[in-house]
């Protein structure tokens, strides 16, 4: 009983020193307390030590020691250690990849309804990556994880139902799951849902809600969301806010988004919505061109060679319009062949199952 009390006390002291609870953060001291608790077979302490040994920004980084600690904890039934081992062995970045071992430990965690293990194993089985594809079980596990409010699982399932390739397309269920994920703060879901709401092709168009999600994703520096939100703030009547558009473009441009850089260049070049600044315009256009934007390169060439940049811009608008027409046509053709693509994918999956003796009836 004394040992039990001691191991919990040491573990608590370790948490206080690691998290700065009631004292200054002291990682070496925290490590010593966790090691004392681990020697008394405290699985939580072993887990924390394992995670500490995986911190690349720490002087204690040692994947082998991490695996040793996590194994000890997982063998004592610690579900998060089992999940951590499964993830480590599946990725194969810090320890040698071992899919069999990974699946074994993920299954151990799934038995205890660990939402993270349900998500990772479910996604692995749904995609058929590194293991035999099992879409039925993959969906089952992802659904269980999503039911525990796991944003990654909600997003993965929602996207699969949206695309209609791995799973039959189900737009209402897709939007429901993506909304739950976005409302849970998952950035990719916020961007995707915002884009869908803005386009209004498969759900009713709602620019206000679209902006809400896109700007939430922008706050977490999602470049695509920031660029799209910037375009809306720049062009959409009733939502126009040029200073906010500039800030959003700057968020995207900070991550080398060439379209945002191009928009900033245009804004400063035209001097319509912001004060004209040719030097600043050239700086942004040069960055955009450097990052692969051919329109920026052409406009920059026109400016530097003394040509009429306004006429050049008009020509670029025509090129962009033609480009959009071609893109829309290709998209229409893609949608027309979606059913064929699904049938081909299903046939390949059936052939794969037949090869493994798994095809039914």
Regions inferred by a protein language model and the residue ranges of each:
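Eukaryotic tandem repeat interaction scaffolds
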Residues: 152, 171-176, 180-259
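Short helix-capping/linker turns of helical repeat alpha-solenoids
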Residues: 3-6, 19-21, 40-42, 55-57, ...
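Structural signature of tandem alpha-helical TPR/SEL1-like repeats
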Residues: 24-33, 59-69, 96-105, 132-141, ...
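Helical anchoring/docking segments at protein termini
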Residues: 320-361
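Hydrophobic face of amphipathic alpha-helices that form TPR/SEL1-like repeat modules
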Residues: 12-19, 48-55, 84-91, 120-127, ...
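Canonical positions in the second alpha-helix
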Residues: 36-37, 72-73, 108-109, 144-145, ...
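TPR/TPR-like (Sel1-like) alpha-helical repeat modules
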Residues: 276-294, 301-308, 314-324
């Amino acid at each position: 009983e004394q040992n039990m009390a001691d191991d919990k006390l040491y573990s608590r002291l370790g948490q206080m020193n690691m998290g700065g609870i009631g004292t200054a953060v002291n990682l070496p001291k925290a490590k010593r307390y966790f090691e004392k608790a681990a020697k008394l077979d405290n699985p939580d302490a072993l887990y924390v030590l394992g995670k500490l040994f995986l911190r690349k920004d720490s002087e204690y980084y040692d994947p082998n020691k991490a695996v040793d600690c996590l194994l000890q904890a997982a063998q004592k039934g610690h579900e998060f250690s089992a999940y951590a081992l499964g993830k480590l062995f599946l990725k194969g970045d810090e320890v040698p990849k071992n899919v069999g071992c990974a699946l074994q430990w993920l299954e151990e965690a799934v038995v205890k309804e660990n939402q993270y293990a349900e998500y990772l194993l479910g996604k692995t089985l749904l995609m058929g990556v590194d293991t035999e594809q099992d879409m039925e079980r993959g969906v089952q596990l992802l659904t269980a994880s999503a039911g525990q409010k796991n944003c990654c699982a909600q997003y993965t399932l929602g996207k699969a139902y949206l695309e209609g390739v791995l799973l039959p397309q189900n737009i209402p269920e897709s939007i429901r799951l993506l909304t739950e994920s976005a409302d849970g703060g998952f950035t990719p879901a916020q961007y995707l849902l915002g884009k869908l709401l803005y386009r209004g092709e498969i759900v009713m168009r709602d620019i206000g809600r679209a902006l809400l999600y896109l700007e939430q994703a922008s706050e977490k520096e999602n470049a695509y969301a920031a660029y799209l939100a910037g375009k809306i703030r720049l062009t959409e009547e009733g939502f126009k806010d040029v200073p906010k558009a500039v800030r959003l473009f700057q968020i995207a441009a900070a991550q080398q988004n060439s379209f945002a850089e191009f928009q900033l260049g245009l804004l400063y070049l035209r001097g319509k919505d912001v004060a004209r600044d040719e030097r600043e315009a050239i700086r942004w256009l040069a960055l955009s061109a450097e990052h692969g934007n051919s329109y920026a390169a052409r406009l920059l060439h026109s400016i530097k060679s003394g040509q009429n940049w306004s006429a050049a811009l008009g020509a670029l608008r025509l090129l962009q319009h033609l480009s959009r027409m071609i893109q829309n046509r290709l998209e229409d053709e893609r949608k027309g062949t979606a059913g064929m693509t699904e049938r081909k994918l299903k046939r390949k999956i059936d052939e794969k199952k037949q090869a493994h003796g798994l095809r039914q009836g």
